[in-house]
């Protein structure tokens, strides 16, 4: 119902989203105190149900042929793929974001990449607006600062994905707004960003970021 309210009868041309990874990530103490991510520590079956519900809502509000990009954690790949299948999304490829530096952790091999599931809704052909030289490895630098959100993505990365599969004033949907990278990338390409975020702290981050970028004032339509 919330997604239908957001869309108001519109259908999305793309889903570009970065859901919680279910890894109980908490940012460093030196970063903003808002660094805890909601719904990031759930039992296996509950997490898959959570994702399935979100993806099903997205699928219902997308055009046939609409492309999806779903970022996720490698260790939760099975749950993400299973949720996609249950929601009616057919994963066609898995893209890899190759970062310019690793992320320090406690595991034997330090993480230097993040995967992204790519595909499109059945029922129509999808739009591919780029050339035939693009590969499944995406080389983009990490944001220099992660002070807005612990898993913040660079605008250039989402800008690249939006350019590859949308045109004009197409609608880009994101059900996990986070730091607002999707709406920022949509804005600078003239696309219409339809974004949801559960945590009020990050809603404020998104609004502030958009206002600074556009020089405009956000309007609250209703409580």
Language model feature labels by segment:
Residues 215-223:
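Short mixed-charge
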Residues 82, 201-212, 216:
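Short alpha-helix adjacent to the SAM-binding motif of class I
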């Amino acid at each position: 119902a919330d997604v239908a309210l957001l869309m108001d009868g519109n259908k999305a041309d793309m889903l570009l989203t970065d859901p919680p990874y279910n890894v109980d990530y908490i940012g460093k103490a030196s970063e903003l105190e808002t660094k805890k991510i909601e719904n990031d520590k759930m039992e296996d079956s509950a997490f898959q149900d959570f994702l399935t519900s979100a993806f099903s809502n997205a699928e219902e509000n997308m055009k046939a042929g609409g492309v999806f990009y779903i970022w996720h954690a490698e260790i939760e790949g099975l749950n993400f793929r299973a949720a996609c299948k249950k929601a009616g999304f057919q994963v066609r490829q898995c893209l890899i974001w190759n970062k310019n530096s690793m992320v320090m952790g406690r595991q034997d091999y330090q993480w230097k990449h993040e995967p992204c599931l790519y595909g499109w809704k059945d029922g129509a052909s999808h739009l591919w607006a780029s050339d035939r030289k693009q590969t499944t490895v995406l080389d983009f630098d990490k944001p220099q600062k992660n002070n807005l959100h612990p898993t913040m993505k660079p605008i250039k990365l989402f800008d690249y994905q939006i350019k590859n599969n949308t045109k004009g004033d197409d609608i880009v949907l994101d059900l996990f707004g986070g730091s607002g990278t999707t709406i920022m990338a949509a804005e600078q390409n003239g696309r219409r960003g339809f974004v949801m975020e559960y945590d009020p702290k990050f809603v404020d981050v998104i609004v502030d970021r958009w206002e600074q970028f556009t020089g405009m004032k956000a309007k609250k339509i209703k409580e």
